[in-house]
Amino acid sequence: MIRVDEATVVLGIESSCDETAAAVVMGGNDVLSSVVTTQIEQHARFGGVVPEIASRAHVEAMTPVIRKALQDSGIGFERIDAVAATVGPGLVGALLVGVSAAKSIALALNKPFIGVNHLEAHLYAALLDDPNVEFPMLVVLVSGGNTLLVNMESHGNYSIIGQTIDDAAGEAFDKVARFLGLGHPGGPAIDREAKLGNAQAIEFPRAMLHDGFDVSFSGLKTAVVNYVRKNPAISTQDVAASFQTAVVDVLVAKSVKAAKHIGAKTIALGGGVAANSLLRQEMTATCTQQGWRLVLPSMAMCTDNAAMIASAGWYRLLQDGPSESSMGAMPNLKLTDRTTS
């Protein structure tokens, strides 16, 4: 059994969607290097990620990205103690590229392989800069594929207390941006347009605002489409600002309710939507008002990256040991599914 401590170095690999990434992390939180190659331009003209294109791009980028991560870290393969890779959820073809690379390196070096849950890794993204947190902690995971309110009771111990019943927050951003002709990815595009608009111009609905901990954004998306079709001369910037405010209002309200329910004094954000400027601003103000601690990932750690994969892998190795060598891609993996022995 490998000894896991602050000197343990993990090579992390990420390829779940449209970013090819590799990183070297020591002790779970000390990021020695983090390299990300994005495929945004390759998918932009299609208005979304094309799985076949993504897989081929990962194959082309994987070796150079890993080589660059090692070079930037200043260490060689001989110093790597374990290799971690995203096994799911994600696009199956894309996942297989990263998993195959990681398992091959682990086998060649005779080092442990750790299959990492991509959702769990997003929980650790905020902790890379601020690892000393108090549990229980509420993690608000908001991305293109998921919107989850997670009670993080300790490292590796989670329960989902709220989630979307239809569209994820990031998915709603993408769909509204596409409808408004703002391009892909939608989150940053909406954020940019919203800064130039009036957030009070349109009163869009806040679905399920007072009901439980689950969220719903499908109705909001439909409301935006219907409003614009009835008012074609409306400012796109006002629509973006009003839509974004509606999403953030729901996320903040649900987060406060969930944090009080579990007795958390710390809230952490994770996922691509955690980069949204209004969400960060409003969550900061709310936590200050409540006397809570807010843990925010750096902007670079909001989007998919391998540093969070290596970090989550380190914690999994510490708690549960390595994954089975037979583990493959698990495209439908849930947050609470195990990836280690």
Q: For each predicted feature, which ranges?
A:
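Conserved phosphate-binding catalytic cores of ATP/NTP-utilizing and phosphoryl-transfer enzymes
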Residues: M1-T8, V116-L138, A312
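N-terminal beta-alpha supersecondary unit
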Residues: A7-R79, A85-P89, H118, H122
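Short beta-strand segments
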Residues: G12-I13, A84-T86, N117, L138-S143, ...
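Glycine-rich phosphate-binding loop and adjoining helix at the ATP-binding site
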Residues: V49, R79-A125, D130
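Conserved phosphate-binding/catalytic loops in two-lobed NTP-binding clefts
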Residues: G115, M283-I309, S323
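A contiguous, well-structured pocket-lining segment that forms one wall/lid of small-molecule binding clefts
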Residues: R192-I267, S277-Q290, L317-D320, D337-S341
